[in-house]
Amino acid sequence: MVSLKACVVAYGFTLLPALVSGSPLVPRYFQKHLVSRCNISAITVQSELGPQLSNTSLIFGPDNVLFPNATERWNTLDTPDVQLVVQPAAESDISKIVKYCNDNSIEFLVRNRGHGTTTSLSAFSGIEINVELLQGITIQPDGETAIFQAGTYGAEVINTLWDQGYVTTTGSTACVGLTGPSLGGGHSRYEGLYGLVMDNIVHYNIVLANGTEIGVNETSHPDLMWALKGAGHNFAIVTSLEKKIYPGENWHQHTYTWTQDKLETVFEALNTFHKSYNGTTPPKMGVNYGAIIMNTSYSTTEAVMEWGFQYAGPGDEAEALLAPFNAIGAIAEDQFDASYPTIAGTTSETCGSAKRAISSAMTLDYNITTERALYDHFVAKVAEYPDLAATAYLWHEGYSTEGYQIIPEDSTAYPHREENHLMVFFTEVPEDSDLLEPALDWAKEAMDLWNGGQPDRLPSTYVNYAQGADYETLESVYGYESWRLERLRSLKAEYDPENRFRYFVPIISDEA
């Protein structure tokens, strides 16, 4: 239950943005009960809100056996304070939940798969709207699009479509949701052919902060359509969306393990490869994922480079493109053809919940000198903190980019179309250890090295990988062109003047 003190603090912080944006002195959702309704139990919400919702909707608190799974987070470092969970069984329930929260001065936060990691989530205390029951997938009669409800996620989407002969853009890991990543862009194995996840969405059904249900597309609220594609967490709850689907095909994967003496050769080959198709990556070579990682099967003191290339087509086509990498002597390698669901499941080993220290960067190319420095730094840290070593990664995501870079940069709120690569450091921090600060320092130092390798460019932060650290700026996340944040804030004042959506990398924070 939310304490009265917490309610007073929340009231003060939430009211200030309303005053700044020119809203009435007391927002509507504070007028009826002010702070007293923050002290509210599951039984009370069940009796008051329950009759308004679909029969199979659920309302429960921390004493319910469903609560741990419903509130689990992929990263437990900074977690929201969930007092109660409401699981709507129908899209129409969501607007009723939002209106109830507004009328009773209760904050709300939407959760599907729980993969958001930013520190701003820890500012939340209130009701979680858990959309996991909304899992409908409907392929449209023309076979060009499908409608996905808010609770769908990667593996479910991929497998359902595959069984009908289709694929679509989803996040790179099968355990993450579909809608959440799309609000920040959504990098995908198919982006070289079809663009980001968000680039394929043609219609959103949403609930605004005041509980109003509207449809958003290129002709209905096109300004909000622009904002939802790249900064959508700040504006609405997506109850379902319609997005493009495509004919499915089998994929080819080739993985390599190289020792550190091949590092310069590998990154030289990668830089050449990513410009080998008219200045970009071959579109069907969807992605190469690479990690500098400890693998004690080979060495307990030196990290190795594990790299996997995934190609949307047959092996002979892929292997012709991979000839430069086949020429680099690997200590282990494997290749196979497989269905797309099998390929999509190859990055699921990190899906479990844990306390993680994370940082990220975006670059145009791989700075080879920097990668050597990162390797040496990694090995030194492994020696210093062996309890962090087993789960530490220097992760490289090299997508094919043609499909999303041909889309005009100003057509969506996503600001990073010129970036070619995503880099991430993460490690798991053992519970009840004193290794959190060293892990966070390691993360920042790795990010600083990546950014230092492109000194003539400003740092860029992919919003879905943002951590909310003080060294991340809103400009690095939402774009350095001044018009971008100006437009977002103008739309925020129009669609969410009371700043109800402020818990995931907010463009206007509690302190604003």
UniProtKB/Swiss-Prot annotation:
UniProt keyword list: FAD, Flavoprotein, Glycoprotein, Oxidoreductase, Signal
Question: What are the EC numbers?
Answer: 1.-.-.-
Q: What happens when the gene is disrupted?
A: Does not affect the production of iso-A82775C.
Practical applications:
Iso-A82775C is a precursor for the biosynthesis of the anticancer natural products chloropestolides A to E via a Diesls-Alder reaction with maldoxin. In the absence of the prenyltransferase iacE, siccayne accumulates instead of iso-A82775C and can also be condensed with maldoxin to produce chloropestolides H to K, which show also antibacterial and anticancer properties.
Q: Where is the signal peptide?
A: 1-22
Superkingdom field: Eukaryota
Instruction: Name a Pfam family for this protein.
Output: BBE
Tell what triggers its expression: Expression is co-regulated with the other genes from the iso-A82775C biosynthesis cluster and probably controlled by the cluster-specific transcription factors iacI and iacK.
Any one Gene Ontology MF annotation carried by this entry is:
FAD binding
Classification via InterPro entries: BBE, FAD-bd_PCMH, FAD-bd_PCMH-like_sf, FAD-bd_PCMH_sub2, FAD-linked_Oxidoreductase, Oxid_FAD_bind_N
Pathway noted in the entry:
Secondary metabolite biosynthesis
Xref: SUPFAM superfamilies: FAD-binding/transporter-associated domain-like
The cofactor named in the record is: FAD
In the UniProt record, which residues carry a glycan? N39, N55, N69, N210, N217, N278, N295, N367
* Role: FAD-linked oxidoreductase; part of the gene cluster that mediates the biosynthesis of iso-A82775C, a enylepoxycyclohexane and biosynthetic precursor of the chloropestolide anticancer natural products. Within the cluster, the prenyltransferase iacE prenylates siccayne to generate pestalodiol E, using dimethylallyl diphosphate (DMAPP) as cosubstrate. The probable oxidoreductase iacF is then involved in the epoxidation of pestalodiol F to pestalodiol F, which is further converted to pestalofone A by the short-chain dehydrogenase/reductase iacG.
- What protein family does this chain belong to? Belongs to the oxygen-dependent FAD-linked oxidoreductase family.
The name this protein goes by in its record: FAD-linked oxidoreductase iacH
Say which species the protein is native to. Answer: Pestalotiopsis fici (strain W106-1 / CGMCC3.15140)
Q: What is the lineage of its organism?
A: Eukaryota, Fungi, Dikarya, Ascomycota, Pezizomycotina
Gene behind the chain: iacH
